[in-house]
Design a protein with these regions (language model features):
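Cysteine-centered motifs
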Residues: 44, 51, 56-59
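N-terminal helix-turn-helix DNA-binding module of bacterial transcription factors
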Residues: 71-144
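Hinge/cleft segment of the Venus flytrap/periplasmic-binding protein
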Residues: 131, 287-288, 304, 393-439
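Amphipathic helical "hinge" segments at domain boundaries
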Residues: 136-196
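Hinge/beta->alpha junction and helix N-cap segments in small-molecule ligand-binding domains
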Residues: 155-164, 185-196, 253-259, 281-299, ...
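Hydrophobic alpha-helical
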Residues: 211-230, 314-376
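Flexible loop/hinge segments that line or gate small-molecule binding clefts
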Residues: 220-258, 374-382
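Hydrophobic alpha-helical segments within soluble ligand-binding/sensing domains
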Residues: 251-277, 327, 393-410
Length: 439
């Protein structure tokens, strides 16, 4: 019989509880400075002072503990003989003996290999059910000694951006599972050049990945790629935007519609008396650059229509790929033409563009609601130009997406198909308590 520490922990715990429940309790006596301690020349084995072994309360308690410990082997033997859950290791040869088949037959059944007769398979499966056999997925994966390649297809981005947080989380997940021979490949496409998306996807397939983390673009382009992934039986996880019709293994991200709805509600707590507010969008050729931003805007406008239909929403598009001077010129023109605007909602992680402009032009009467705890946004929040940020836990998304591929492909486990990130509101007062590594 093989004994584990986990087997005797409950017994030791029970014995210790009984000891400390005694009267007087040992813990209480240790805290008391004054207690009856007759000294007749015998050194106490517990307190290192002179005592009478027969009357010393410390020695009496230690004798009880020693007696309880001496009972542990007897209790273990009793539990083992009565089949009370001792964690004996079940070997393949034990299963084969119980089923009356060969070890090779059991191995083929466990690993779902062919060349096993129906009767032999039924015998083995019956024994597996009886003993509640559960294979050690981690041990099997380690023994397999196979190299796995996971590809992440993400938009190109500047340093300290939302997507960099996702990359850091993904790389951390691989680092923590390096014993399983995981490898990650980061591949990027340009949102300024949509044709690079399918080209990046094609190059990714040439690497023969075992799994893919994917940020969708248009439905048509994304579906063309995911259809090929299904044909090649390559699992994929979606980030940023959920497209259930594509049948991904899993999705990680916020409910964009609810996020926009929530943002409008929070903003109007401080802007309920305003006649108009500003909505800032990041666009390319006049269109928003992601379905996520599009859904946020839909949710935002839905709340405003339902609760503040009289408030005018003015829209300002900031084209992608422009420099700081170009953005500041657009913002200066807007605020010069609309001096009554005091509240702004940005649909992406670049709230710092507007926030930085407000700081440089000393406009202290405009409050911004934006997205993502990237460093530039956090700095604007600390300096007062951004009032609120909605955190998306980008680092956690990157980590969890790789973890989902690992659990499904390597450990052969089921994963949850939809995983919404919390909609967490940050302000100047709690921004320093936000931790990206909360996993």
């Amino acid at each position: 019989m093989i004994l584990y520490i986990s087997d005797i922990q409950p017994i030791i715990l029970f014995s210790t509880i009984q000891l400390f429940r005694s009267d007087p309790p040992l813990g209480k006596m240790a805290a008391d400075k004054e207690f009856p301690m007759p000294a007749d020349g015998i050194r106490c084995g517990f307190t290192a002072v002179f005592c009478n072994k027969r009357t010393c309360p410390y020695c009496r308690q230690m004798k009880k503990l020693a007696k309880a410990i001496r009972l542990i082997p007897t209790l273990l033997l009793f539990l083992h003989k009565n089949g009370m859950g001792m964690n004996d290791r079940i070997r393949i040869k034990d299963i084969a003996a119980k089923a009356g088949v060969s070890v090779g037959t059991v191995d083929r059944v466990l690993h779902k290999r062919p060349n096993v007769s129906k009767s032999a398979r039924e015998k083995v499966e019956r024994i597996l059910r009886e003993i509640d056999y559960r294979p050690n997925a981690y041990a099997s994966a380690l023994a397999c000694n196979k190299d796995y390649v996971f590809c992440c297809i993400l938009p190109e981005h500047a340093s300290e951006a939302y997507w960099e947080e996702i990359e850091l989380g993904a790389m951390k997940a691989v680092e923590l599972r390096r014993d399983f021979h995981l490898n990650i490949r980061l591949r990027h496409f340009s949102r300024l050049h949509p044709e690079t998306y399918l080209e990046t996807c094609r190059r990714c397939l040439e690497e023969k990945p075992d799994g893919i983390v994917l940020v969708p673009t248009t439905v048509e382009e994304t579906k063309a790629f995911t259809d090929e992934l299904h044909r090649q039986d390559i699992p994929f996880v979606l980030l940023d935007s959920n497209m259930p019709d594509l049948e991904p293994l899993s999705f990680y991200g916020q409910d964009s519609f609810q996020s926009g709805y929530f943002a409008a509600r929070m903003l109007m707590l401080i802007a309920r008396k305003e006649e108009s507010i500003l909505l800032v969008r990041q666009t390319f050729e006049g269109k928003v650059t992601s379905r996520q931003q599009e859904n946020r805007e839909v949710g935002f406008r839905r709340y405003m229509e339902e609760h503040y239909p009289e408030v005018e929403i003015k829209t300002l598009n900031l084209p992608m790929g422009k420099d700081k001077a170009a953005y500041h010129e657009l913002l200066e023109d807007f605020f010069h033409a609309n001096p009554g605007i005091h509240h702004c909602f940005t649909t992406n992680s670049r709230a710092y563009i507007t926030g930085g402009f407000l700081l440089e032009t000393n406009r202290r009467n405009v409050q911004i609601m934006g997205y993502d705890m990237v460093p530039k946004n956090a700095e604007c929040m600390r300096r007062g130009s951004i009032s609120f940020l909605i955190a998306q836990h980008a680092y956690q998304q990157g980590f969890s997406s790789i973890d989902a591929l690992f659990r499904n492909i390597v450990l052969k486990k089921e994963v949850r198909p939809i995983n919404y990130m919390p909609i967490e509101l940050l302000s100047k007062e709690n921004v320093d308590f936000y931790h990206r590594t909360r996993i």
